[in-house]
Curated annotation (Swiss-Prot):
Molecular function, one GO term: RNA cap binding
InterPro entries: NCBP2, NCBP2_RRM, Nucleotide-bd_a/b_plait_sf, RBD_domain_sf, RRM_dom
Residues annotated for mRNA binding in this entry: 10, 33, 102-106, 113-117, 123-124
One Pfam family linked to the record: RRM_1
Record keywords: mRNA processing, mRNA splicing, Nucleus, RNA-binding, RNA-mediated gene silencing
Annotated organism of origin: Drosophila grimshawi
UniProt-listed SUPFAM superfamilies: RNA-binding domain, RBD
Designated name of the protein: Nuclear cap-binding protein subunit 2
One BP annotation, GO: regulatory ncRNA-mediated post-transcriptional gene silencing
Subcellular localization(s) per the UniProt record: Nucleus
Amino acid sequence: MTASVDLSSYRDQHFKGSRSEQERSLRDSTTLYVGNLSFYTTEEQIHELFSRCGDVRIIVMGLDKYKKTPCGFCFVEYYTRAEAEAAMRFVNGTRLDDRLIRVDWDAGFIEGRQYGRGKTGGQVRDEYRTDYDAGRGGYGKLLSQKIAPNTDNR
């Protein structure tokens, strides 16, 4: 493998199985995790970009667990490993909706993984952000809750 398609150090802590089973699943996978998406990026935009590398089998958009709205990630599954490797080489680090997107291997989509794992329903990384990011809903969700005006007092 070349460096651009090697496995990263990230491992899904919720993977059901041993570390060696996870490694094997990642090495054989045709599924990619795509991160740092804008909350406004559409499935059609993702399909247009990733289909340049091969036939996309399915795209699963990441959703806020409670609101069921996009929360900045998705899974893209190809029919072959070679197509997925091409996407790792050519799409990782490119711009989509004016954001540098991250592409990484995923062991394979399982129902339920499309939901954010943060306390507020989105991604954990968006809970604690202190910077303002218009493409990811403004300030971090926990910070936004602290600074939101109290509308109960009339």
